[in-house]
Structures are given as structure tokens and as C-alpha cells.
Swiss-Prot record:
Annotated S-S bridges: none
Family statement: Belongs to the SfsA family.
GO MF annotations in UniProt: DNA binding
Protein name (Swiss-Prot/TrEMBL): Sugar fermentation stimulation protein homolog
Pfam families assigned to the protein according to its UniProt record, in alphabetical order: SfsA, SfsA_N
Length: 238
């Protein structure tokens, strides 16, 4: 996935969920949009180097968007969770998700279920059961362990219930945890943050719902991040 043209700055603060103040290399201060409403644990500390993009849209109050955080150890995290579906869509098109590579038709944002949900991707293939794929972003990393979620997710809990219902109807149901952070090589659910999500997903997996985690890798050109891709599955610690 190609990233938009990025510029760097220093983070001053994040506030009101959707806003952040940054300090430009010139010393000027600018307010930008933050698309991530989660806790962003470890990915949004004062003084962090951040990378932001610019939009030419005339309707946006804040034309600049926070895209990435560069951590003190040099690792990168894409905090713009709107990018995750684009990342996974390209991986599905390129047959990079080996567990789903047999499907040829990809339908994004399809309404389904009894709780007024939209599945991120519905996959279809000749002679194959329909496959419902829910995408979750991995931005929380401790050591080399990627985790989800970084805050209690009632929406995520709902998605697990919906996926289990699809599985019971004879379809495939998959949670795909996509690495938006390049600092992990194994994955687990952060049960200490959302024990209910952990419980629901474990019960769903016992009944046939599938879950996979894939690592992310950034491409760098002239010291500027230019692309992000999913590389390979990592061990899922249950």
C-alpha cells in the first residue's frame, strides 16, 4: 500500500479524540486531524516524531492528517486505522493472505448479521463457502508482542458475535489482525484490557471462527516512509 506524501513533525499533544498539535521543523505549531480514537498506547507520546499527510479537500477543517508515529527505537506505527482496510484489500488481491488465497471475488463493506453490521470483506469463490472477514489493526506492541485491542471494544465484541452467527450458518468467518506496527513477531489478545473480547473470541474460535495475525513492513525512501505491506503470518498465542 502506497502511503501519501509525508512530512515529519514533533508531537505536542493529542486531545478531543480527533485532534493533535504538532511542532513543525520551523518551530511553528499546527493542529492536525487524528483518525484513531483508540488509546494509541505507546504510539502517541509527547515529543514523538510523527508523519503527517496533506489533503487538498476544500471541505476539511483540518487539511493535515496524522499518519504514522516513529518511536524512539526507530520502529514505525501507522496510527491512521482507516488505512487498515486498504492494506488488507491489496493483500487479498495479491493473494498474500495464504489462508484466504483460494478466493477470487472480494466485496468490501457488505451489510450482514442481526446487529446492523457491515463486514469489512465478503469473499466468494467457485465451490467455496462464503467467507466473512473482519479486519482489526495491531498498533499496541510490548517487546516483540503485538496485541489487540488497546482499549475496551464493544464494537469488536459485536463483530465476534456476528461472525459466530455466520459460522453457524455454514459460512467461513475470519478475524484478520493486520500489523500497522513493524515491531512484533507474535500476537495475542490483550485480555487485561478487554477480558470480554478475549472470552468471546476464544469461545467463537472453539466453534470454528478463524483468527490470523499478519506482520507489517514499511518501505523507506530517502528516510521517508513510502509504503506499508503485510508480509507473513505470525504465531497467534491463545
Amino acid at each position: 500500500m502506497q502511503l501519501p506524501a509525508l512530512q515529519s513533525a514533533k508531537l505536542i499533544r493529542r486531545y478531543k479524540r480527533f485532534l493533535a498539535d504538532i511542532e513543525l521543523p520551523t518551530g511553528d505549531v499546527m493542529t492536525i486531524h487524528c483518525a484513531n480514537t483508540g488509546a494509541m498506547t505507546g504510539c502517541g507520546e509527547k515529543g514523538d516524531t510523527i508523519w503527517y499527510s496533506h489533503s487538498d479537500s476544500q471541505t476539511r477543517k483540518y487539511p493535515h492528517s496524522w499518519e504514522l508515529t516513529q518511536l524512539a527505537n526507530g520502529q514505525l506505527c501507522c496510527i491512521n486505522t482507516h488505512r487498515s482496510n486498504q492494506l488488507v484489500f491489496e493483500a487479498l488481491q495479491n493473494k498474500q493472505i495464504k489462508e484466504l488465497a483460494m478466493y477470487d471475488e472480494i466485496y468490501p463493506e457488505v451489510k450482514y448479521g442481526e446487529e446492523n453490521s457491515r463486514i469489512d470483506f465478503l469473499l466468494k469463490g467457485e465451490g467455496l463457502p462464503d467467507c466473512y472477514v473482519e479486519v482489526k489493526s495491531i498498533t499496541l506492541v510490548k517487546g516483540n508482542l503485538g496485541m489487540f485491542p488497546d482499549a475496551v471494544t464493544t464494537r469488536g465484541q459485536k463483530h465476534v458475535r456476528e461472525l459466530l452467527a455466520m459460522k453457524k450458518q455454514g459460512h467461513r468467518a475470519v478475524v484478520l489482525f493486520a500489523g500497522l506496527h513493524n515491531g512484533f513477531d507474535r500476537f495475542k489478545i490483550a485480555e487485561y484490557i478487554d477480558p470480554e473480547y478475549d472470552r468471546l473470541l476464544k469461545e467463537a474460535m472453539e466453534q470454528g471462527v478463524e483468527a490470523y495475525a499478519y506482520a507489517g513492513q514499511f518501505e523507506i525512501s530517502n528516510e521517508i516512509p513510502t509504503a506499508l505491506s503485510l508480509t507473513e503470518s505470525v504465531p497467534y498465542i491463545k
